[in-house]
Amino acid sequence: MSRSLKKGPYIEYKLLKKIEELNKQEAKKTLKTWSRSSTIIPQMIGHTIAVYNGKQFFPVFISDQMVGHKLGEFVPTRNFRSHVKSDRKTKR
C-alpha cells in the first residue's frame, strides 16, 4: 500500500535540512545517511548521498530519473555467492 497523497512523501527531517542548507550554499558535498526509507525529492538532484547498507556507506549520485524512489532501492544489502560447480579434478 502506498503512502497517502495528503501526507506527502516521507523524508527524514535532518536529511531534508542538510539538503536545503547545501542548496542555499550551492555546495556539492557527500552526505551520509542511515535513512534508506527517505523518498528522493527534486531538491536532491545533483547531490551525492552516501546511504548505509548495514555494513558500509555507498555513494549514490541523485539524477532526475530517481525522483519518487527510495534511497535504499539503489544500495545492495546482500552479496550473492553462488555455489562453485564441482570439477571432475576435485572429485579424484
UniProtKB/Swiss-Prot annotation:
The keyword Signal does not apply. GO terms for molecular function: rRNA binding; structural constituent of ribosome. It is found in: Plastid, Chloroplast. GO terms for cellular component: chloroplast; mitochondrial small ribosomal subunit. It holds the Pfam family Ribosomal_S19. Keywords: Chloroplast, Plastid, Ribonucleoprotein, Ribosomal protein, RNA-binding, rRNA-binding. Its main location: plastid. One of its GO terms (biological process) is translation. Gene3D superfamilies: 30s Ribosomal Protein S19, Chain A (3.30.860.10). The keyword Nucleotidyltransferase does not apply. Belongs to the universal ribosomal protein uS19 family. Protein S19 forms a complex with S13 that binds strongly to the 16S ribosomal RNA. This is Small ribosomal subunit protein uS19c.
